[in-house]
């Protein structure tokens, strides 16, 4: 017989009755019925009930062992009676009558229970992550993650992609977030950076003649935590293709995503390929976001013309100063009490807007502050434009175009949730396309890249030389599912002269571009194919499939919201010797200078 087990805790069935078996696992739960002791033994695969009576030689051993101790049990498989069988367990028709028990590892008193559904503070869960990972739902999420990654790899390989590994230590580059820097001992005063993405390397792979690349790539960004973003590191399905158009990229990744979501999404419907393509300008108008949630049936509309020079002076004055008006429909909301409208108006003010005007369409006619002041024919034109009927309402956001778009998007989501309109049990995919190449920094007045600086502008050099930069579109695109951005991608700018010009418009002189991207630019000067790609976020894919609201629920050892690893106590201080080897002297805020004995005294390090 095997030293530890003949079967897992999920394998035994009625056909095993009468066999002598050995199981090993964790003591999940104990139930003492006086003369009988029941122990649920758990391993990675499942649960098996172990039983012994008071006359058994192992009774005292099992009675004394704590929950989550690791034990090995040898015994006989017996059938449960019809009354005691547990149809919810795969092993619920049998139990193991214990003959010998070996305690392999005794557990201390638990700071948090593994069995049961009790909720614990996140800091406790992350401090004792090894216990948290034993809990059924969390454990299942990690198994799901592993299976999803395996499926992604298989599907990419089936599409003709080959997996290559790119460097983890690289050079710092301006990709939109702060870099994690690694000091060089051999080159004092110089630093490596952990890659925010394998962007330049995968493009140079295309220049090197590799046609279809992919990688389950770790990415590192020093940015704040969000529900759908873990601080520090994340993983993405990074891929790149040569000699492709935008549609070729879409056609390559859509079947991979559809396949994975159908494989692991249960009975939830998945948008079939090809996914809807929504231009950025349309997305901002209709959805108030470049990450539209298509489960929300509401569609916003521009009604500026119906308020311009009209009787509702508050809006007409703002329109004259460059503002626009967005309308957000609220079907069936006419019967809502006045308090609901007042609460929405208060919420709008708390969100930084001036308020939230509305019109209620009743059988007797339109009602509300705007309807009292705006000419009836204009109110009717708005009703027709949004295809509203008696019993519906409509809300309005008036502001400068970008602010009006973003706020109307928030209103659209709030109304959808208040009215219970969001579709459930589905994964709604779309592409957001035709992003602007540039945007204006409102604080500095400087033109900046709005998305990926390595994207090819639509119209190429002619567009850069002849068009208003803010009117130039790029071959940039995002994959969105249920309002969550899974990936950004682009057809790349592979021509050095176009790249120099694109960066010049954003305020980067040629010398700085060469200093920051010299390796890639040199590669482009020796024959670069047109190429493009994307990089769907694996953590977010698993979060959606697991139906988890927080991305940390699908990461094995995540940092908390303050970018701390509570299990490993990272970040931590290092010794004076380590700092001196790296030629680093710390200049810390006074409140951070206190260190424990034996740790680094940063103000003394050279």
From Swiss-Prot:
Per UniProt, the keywords (alphabetical) are:
Aminoacyl-tRNA synthetase, ATP-binding, Cytoplasm, Ligase, Nucleotide-binding, Protein biosynthesis
GO cellular component terms given for this protein: cytoplasm
A Gene Ontology molecular function term for this protein is:
ATP binding
Note down the stretches annotated as region Aspartate: 199-202
Q: Where is this site: Important for tRNA non-discrimination?
A: 33
Catalytic activities: tRNA(Asx) + L-aspartate + ATP = L-aspartyl-tRNA(Asx) + AMP + diphosphate
User: Which Pfam families does this UniProt record tie to the protein?
Assistant: GAD (PF02938), tRNA-synt_2 (PF00152), tRNA_anti-codon (PF01336)
* Gene Ontology BP terms: aspartyl-tRNA aminoacylation
Q: Mind telling me which PROSITE patterns this protein's record contains?
A: AA_TRNA_LIGASE_II
- Provide the binding site for ATP: 221-223, 485, 537-540
Keyword Phosphoprotein on entry: no
Protein's cellular compartments: Cytoplasm
Q: Which amino acid positions bind L-aspartate, per UniProt?
A: 175, 221, 451, 492
The keyword ATP-binding is annotated on this UniProt entry:
yes
InterPro entries from the entry?
Answer: Aa-tRNA-synt_II, aa-tRNA-synth_II, aa-tRNA-synth_II/BPL/LPL, Asp-tRNA-ligase_1, Asp-tRNA-ligase_1_N, Asp/Asn-tRNA-synth_IIb, AspRS_core, GAD-like_sf
List its EC numbers: 6.1.1.23
Principal subcellular localisation of the protein: cytoplasm
The entry sums up its family as follows: Belongs to the class-II aminoacyl-tRNA synthetase family. Type 1 subfamily.
Described function: Aspartyl-tRNA synthetase with relaxed tRNA specificity since it is able to aspartylate not only its cognate tRNA(Asp) but also tRNA(Asn). Reaction proceeds in two steps: L-aspartate is first activated by ATP to form Asp-AMP and then transferred to the acceptor end of tRNA(Asp/Asn).
**What quaternary structure, including any partners, is listed in this protein's UniProt entry?**
Homodimer.
Q: Which PANTHER family does the record cross-reference, listed alphabetically? A: ASPARTATE--TRNA LIGASE, MITOCHONDRIAL, ASPARTYL/LYSYL-TRNA SYNTHETASE
Enumerate the HAMAP family for this protein: Asp_tRNA_synth_type1
Q: What is this protein called?
A: Aspartate--tRNA(Asp/Asn) ligase
């Amino acid at each position: 017989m095997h030293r530890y087990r003949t079967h897992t805790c999920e394998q035994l069935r009625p056909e095993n009755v009468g066999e002598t078996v050995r199981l090993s696992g964790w003591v999940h739960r104990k139930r003492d019925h006086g003369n009988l002791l029941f122990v649920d033994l758990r391993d990675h695969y499942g649960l098996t009930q172990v039983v012994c009576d008071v006359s058994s030689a192992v009774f005292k051993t099992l009675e004394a062992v704590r929950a989550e101790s690791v034990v090995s049990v040898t015994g006989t498989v017996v059938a449960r009676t019809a009354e005691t069988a547990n149809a919810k367990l795969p092993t619920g028709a049998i139990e193991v009558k214990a003959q010998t028990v070996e305690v392999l590892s005794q557990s201390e008193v638990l700071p948090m229970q593994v069995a049961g559904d009790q909720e614990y503070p996140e800091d406790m869960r992350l401090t004792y992550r090894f216990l948290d990972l034993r809990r059924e739902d969390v454990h299942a999420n990690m198994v799901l993650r592993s299976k999803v990654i395996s499926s992604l790899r298989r599907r990419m390989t089936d599409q003709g992609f080959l997996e290559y590994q790119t460097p983890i230590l690289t050079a710092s580059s301006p990709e939109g977030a702060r870099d994690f820097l690694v000091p060089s001992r051999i080159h004092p005063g110089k630093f490596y950076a952990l890659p925010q993405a394998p962007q330049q390397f995968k493009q140079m792979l295309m220049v090197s003649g590799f046609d279809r690349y992919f990688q389950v790539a770790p990415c590192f960004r020093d940015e704040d935590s969000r529900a759908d973003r873990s601080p520090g590191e994340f993983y993405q399905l990074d891929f790149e293709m040569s000699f492709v158009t935008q549609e070729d990229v879409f056609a390559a990744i859509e079947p991979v995503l559809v396949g994975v979501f159908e494989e692991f999404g249960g009975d939830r419907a998945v948008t079939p390929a090809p996914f809807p393509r929504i231009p950025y300008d349309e997305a901002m108008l209709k959805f108030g976001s470049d990450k539209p949630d298509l489960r929300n049936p509401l569609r916003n509309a521009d009604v500026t013309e119906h308020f311009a020079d009209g009787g509702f002076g508050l809006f007409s004055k703002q329109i004259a100063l460059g503002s626009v008006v967005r309308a957000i429909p609220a079907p069936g909301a006419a019967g809502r009490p006045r308090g609901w409208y007042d609460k929405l108006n208060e919420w709008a003010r708390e969100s930084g807007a001036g308020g939230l005007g509305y019109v209620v369409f009743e059988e007797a006619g339109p009602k509300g502050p705007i309807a009292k002041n705006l000419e009836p024919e204009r109110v009717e034109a708005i009703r027709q434009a949004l295809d509203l009927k008696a019993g519906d309402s409509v809300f309005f956001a008036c502001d400068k175009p970008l602010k009006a778009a973003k706020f109307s998007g928030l209103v659209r989501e709030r109304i959808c949730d208040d009215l219970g309109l969001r579709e459930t049990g589905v994964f709604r995919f779309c592409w957001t396309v035709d992003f602007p190449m540039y945007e204006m920094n409102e604080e500095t007045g400087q033109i900046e890249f709005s998305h990926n600086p390595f994207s090819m502008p639509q119209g190429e050099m002619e567009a850069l030389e002849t068009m208003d930069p803010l009117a130039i579109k790029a071959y940039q695109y995002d994959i969105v599912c249920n309002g969550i951005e899974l990936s950004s991608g682009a057809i790349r700018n592979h021509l050095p002269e176009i790249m120099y010009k694109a960066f010049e418009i954003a305020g980067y002189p040629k010398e700085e571009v060469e200093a920051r991207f010299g390796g890639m630019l040199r590669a482009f000067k020796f024959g670069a194919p047109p190429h493009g790609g994307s990089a769907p976020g694996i953590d977010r894919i698993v979060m959606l499939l697991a139906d988890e609201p927080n991305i940390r629920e699908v990461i094995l050892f995540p940092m908390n919201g303050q970018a701390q690893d509570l299990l490993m106590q990272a970040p931590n201080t290092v010794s004076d010797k380590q700092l001196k080897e790296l030629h680093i002297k710390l200049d810390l805020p006074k409140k951070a200078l206190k260190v424990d004995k034996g740790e680094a005294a940063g103000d003394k390090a050279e």
